[in-house]
């Protein structure tokens, strides 16, 4: 299973660098994300002038994880001090998948660093492994 964060999801909606790589990688994947994705994606779509039905269509392919008490408690305890609130909630949601989690799909440097600190594999189609630890990319 792959966990998709908002930075990756938006690449599905808007053609930008690595969008085609991501679409190809997700073509036959089982994809999960936090219920946060619903709100974040719709808010971003409004800013970008994209119709809500486009977001809803892409969200249909994603199983959303409810933000329960356990997930919120886990988000408080993530190791990375630089991880912001919503990214900590994404990471905690991904960790809810346990051993079934193959990788967190993200193009967000802080989240990628937080994932590796927690022992989660990071996958960013089109980017080289370890891109998040480089000073330039």
Regions found by a protein language model. Name each.
Residues 28-31, 61-63, 98-103:
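Short active-site oxyanion
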Residues 19, 38, 52-55, 72, ...:
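A general structural signal for well-ordered alpha-helical segments in protein cores
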Residues 8-9, 37, 71, 90, ...:
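Alpha-helix capping/helix-boundary segments
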Residues 1-33, 45-57, 130-135:
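Short, well-structured N-terminal submotif of metal-dependent ribonuclease cores
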Residues 34, 96-137:
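Acidic, PIN/NYN-like endoribonuclease modules and their adjacent C-terminal/linker elements
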Residues 54-55, 63-64, 69, 73, ...:
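Alpha-helical scaffold domains
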Residues 4, 33, 66, 85-88, ...:
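Short beta-strand scaffold positions
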Residues 61-81, 87-93:
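Acidic catalytic patch
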């Amino acid at each position: 299973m792959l966990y998709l964060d908002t930075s990756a999801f938006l690449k599905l909606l808007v053609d930008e660098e690595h969008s085609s790589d991501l679409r190809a990688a997700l073509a036959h994947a089982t994809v999960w994300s936090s219920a946060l994705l619903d709100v974040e994606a719709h808010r971003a779509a409004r800013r970008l002038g994209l119709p809500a039905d486009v977001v809803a269509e892409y969200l249909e392919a994603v199983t959303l994880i409810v933000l329960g008490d356990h997930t919120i408690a886990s988000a408080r305890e993530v190791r990375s001090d630089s991880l912001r609130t919503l990214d900590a909630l994404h990471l905690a949601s991904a960790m809810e998948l346990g051993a079934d989690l193959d990788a967190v799909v993200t193009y967000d440097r802080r989240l990628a660093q937080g994932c590796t600190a927690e022992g989660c594999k990071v996958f960013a189609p089109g980017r080289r492994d370890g891109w998040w630890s480089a000073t330039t990319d």
